[in-house]
Amino acid sequence: MQGDWVLLLLLGLRIHLSFGVIPVEEENPVFWNQKAKEALDVAKKLQPIQTSAKNLILFLGDGMGVPTVTATRILKGQLGGHLGPETPLAMDHFPFTALSKTYNVDRQVPDSAGTATAYLCGVKANYKTIGVSAAARFNQCNSTFGNEVFSVMHRAKKAGKSVGVVTTTRVQHASPAGTYAHTVNRDWYSDADMPSSALQEGCKDIATQLISNMDIDVILGGGRKFMFPKGTPDPEYPGDSDQSGVRLDSRNLVEEWLAKYQGTRYVWNREQLMQASQDPAVTRLMGLFEPTEMKYDVNRNASADPSLAEMTEVAVRLLSRNPQGFYLFVEGGRIDQGHHAGTAYLALTEAVMFDSAIEKASQLTNEKDTLTLITADHSHVFAFGGYTLRGTSIFGLAPLNAQDGKSYTSILYGNGPGYVLNSGNRPNVTDAESGDVNYKQQAAVPLSSETHGGEDVAIFARGPQAHLVHGVQEQNYIAHVMAFAGCLEPYTDCGLAPPADENRPTTPVQNSAITMNNVLLSLQLLVSMLLLVGTALVVS
């Protein structure tokens, strides 16, 4: 359904441009001078919030490099009927930005495990290791012990705050696991994934660590199968043995978690989640909505599976009950997986959903007492170019053919499963093909899975101490900013005054000039479509 909408959008925008309906006001220097003046006026009034932060939120767009951010902005605008680039993302309203250097200690191009250790625990680490220093070695169990490093979330819990993890991947995946786990192999999801030698040496699988390493108040995402004994039928897919429990130790980790605390609730579908969120007796909530990863948003059953924005809202509301504040980690994890598949449509629609979760959290919190950071763990070999006309679908074709006389999409990958060269020939691509949900953009090098990119990624910040996010920083700096703002170890003597008592939520500031411009663009697009329809009727 959404793929059909993108194709219609592509057609409409090309018609839009064929009639020359680029906003007339943009031809006048006054338009751009006024926009810059308004932005400058906002910047001149910007003052850092010098208090401590009661609440800490980290949004992690897995694989959301700067090219992905820009393409997401265009897609968000186009899905709203606009040309695209002028439409702001929710994260665009955050006033402080920086660049983060993402390399692992042992890899120039990183993975999500070592990077999670950096931005969550404050220490750079090795490839495929989580919650341990670089002294630990991949897959060597005995190098875990004595090399553990602890997340800011762990320190927040120790300080009396409530804590939560929300993700669209399995909750045992590399990024969320960085908040609670210590492991030398990111793939040790359950005991069934571990060698017997590691178990004998005392290493624990990630699912076990989820319920044993710390008291997490809210856990929302996928990953059911790693919590239940082998052969336990999945409640959603009881006839599919591939979705059944996989644990070899016969432990039911969900039951163990439920028995550990008062006020616990386990849910596995959207209806149960919404019911639990309205129950004041629920003080700890675990929601596992798929056996492994949650569905891509374009494939999500909206009545059965919660969106990332819905999970974020539930988490914020529940955690906000604690007068001492909270720490929340929210991951848009399938942005990364869409890119690995070489399928930009999946990656970018996930990123649009991720931005909607940021907007929801902004509506529910107050920047006076809540530090919110947005970043990525790494980038991807994803790019878009081709001198496309403004308003061309982000999934569309470049206006001119390549030297081989064939069309090509604006979006391309440096490597991945989209490699299509056959005896030196490359196929033509049509608008219909490039707009399909499952279309894999062409790649220069054949790989079964597209790789990460090694360039710096952006950090966006708002709230107390957000001004510390500046310049170009090592990725582990992120954890230190959050720990300092929250006066958490090792900054318990931060010397910061507590935040002012503000109860009203803050919402993203909307630029009135941008809003009016979007309205005009929508009207112009409508006029273009009506002209086309009228022309078609006359011809017929």
Curated annotation (Swiss-Prot):
Task: State the name under which the record lists this protein.
Answer: Intestinal-type alkaline phosphatase 1
What binding partners and quaternary form does the record give?
Homodimer.
Species the sequence originates in: Rattus norvegicus (Rat)
Keyword Zinc included in the entry's annotation: yes
Q: Which residues are glycosylated?
A: N142, N301, N428
GO CC terms of this entry = external side of plasma membrane; plasma membrane
Pro-peptide region(s): 512-540
One Pfam match: Alk_phosphatase
* Lipid tethering residues (GPI-anchor amidated asparagine): N511
Q: What are the entry keywords?
A: Calcium, Cell membrane, Disulfide bond, Glycoprotein, GPI-anchor, Hydrolase, Lipoprotein, Magnesium, Membrane, Metal-binding, Signal, Zinc
According to its UniProt record, which residues of this chain constitute the active site? S112 (phosphoserine intermediate)
Q: Which InterPro entries match?
A: Alkaline_phosphatase, Alkaline_phosphatase_AS, Alkaline_phosphatase_core_sf
UniProt record similarity statement: Belongs to the alkaline phosphatase family.
| A single GO BP | cellular response to BMP stimulus
